[in-house]
Design a protein with these regions (language model features):
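Short coil turn/linker residues within repeat-based beta-strand modules
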Residues: 28-29, 70-71, 109-111, 149, ...
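Entry beta-strands of beta-propeller and related beta-repeat scaffolds
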Residues: 7-13, 54-57, 94-97, 133-136, ...
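Short coil-to-beta transitions that initiate beta-strands within beta-rich domains
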Residues: 1-8, 33-51, 74-92, 114-131, ...
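Sequence/structural signature of beta-propeller modules
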Residues: 1-22, 212, 216-227
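Kelch-like beta-propeller repeat domains
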Residues: 67-74, 107, 173-175, 209-212, ...
Length: 227
């Protein structure tokens, strides 16, 4: 999932620690609360994307949509029994959502078509639209889709880095979190090196430790800003 998404008039991000959606009107410099789920009527927030002028939110109770100018989330699809949606992403004017075991596609989020339920990737955890491709963070590594999610091809497989549980992209860099640490790629996930200067906050979510946002330690902010 992209940890920060950019809509035409604002940027949005999920705050997993406080179960809320935050908004920025100044190019990710400052953030305020867009939607706070104080009484948990929607459940635990899992994934967020911007699609056809609206926000789409995955929670443990289903998929919701809202206008991007006012937080009015309405249920468009209930959770799947026995195989819950864990993330959502907009790609080539279609919505894609993953359970741990399958990929689904929809135009508006209400009716989902199964696109892939193979075992080659292991469990799916996160989807990301990056540099014109749809990426997935999976139990076995990083995979890239073709033919609208029907096929998934290995981009990076390595047991040494651990299980990939979260992806985010900024500029030409990919950021990832595995169950062994934080990593960054400069060549669209073909090679990874440790990103030791990433710090939290983060929390347990979706089967692994989920990155809240990538940011640098103070001493390195002047040389490279990634927020």
């Amino acid at each position: 999932m992209p940890l920060v998404i950019d809509a035409p008039d604002a940027s949005f991000r999920l705050n997993y620690l406080f179960n809320r959606v935050e908004i920025s009107h100044d190019f990710r410099q400052t953030w305020s609360i867009f939607y706070k789920d104080e009484n948990h009527p929607l459940g635990a927030l899992r994934g967020l994307t911007f699609h056809r002028g609206a926000l789409f939110l995955v929670t443990d109770s289903g998929i919701y949509s809202s206008p991007s100018d006012v937080p009015q989330f309405t249920l468009v699809s209930p959770q799947r029994k026995g195989a819950e949606f864990v993330d959502i992403e907009s790609y080539e004017n279609m919505l894609y959502a993953c359970t741990n075991d399958a990929i689904f596609q929809a135009s508006s989020g209400s009716r989902w078509r199964l696109k892939y339920d193979g075992k080659a990737c292991g469990h799916f955890f996160s989807l990301l639209h990056f540099q014109g491709k749809l990426f997935a963070a999976c139990e076995k590594g990083i995979y890239v889709s073709s033919q609208e999610g029907k096929f998934w091809h290995p981009r990076f497989i390595s047991k040494e880095l651990g299980m990939f549980v979260a992806l985010d992209g900024l500029g030409d860099k990919l950021f990832a979190q595995t169950d062994k640490g934080f990593f960054v790629s400069d060549d669209a996930a073909q090679h990874w090196h440790p990103q030791d200067n990433v710090k939290g906050p983060w929390t347990a979510a979706m089967g692994g430790t989920m990155l809240f946002e990538p940011r640098l330690k103070k001493r390195e902010k002047n040389s490279e800003k990634i927020l």
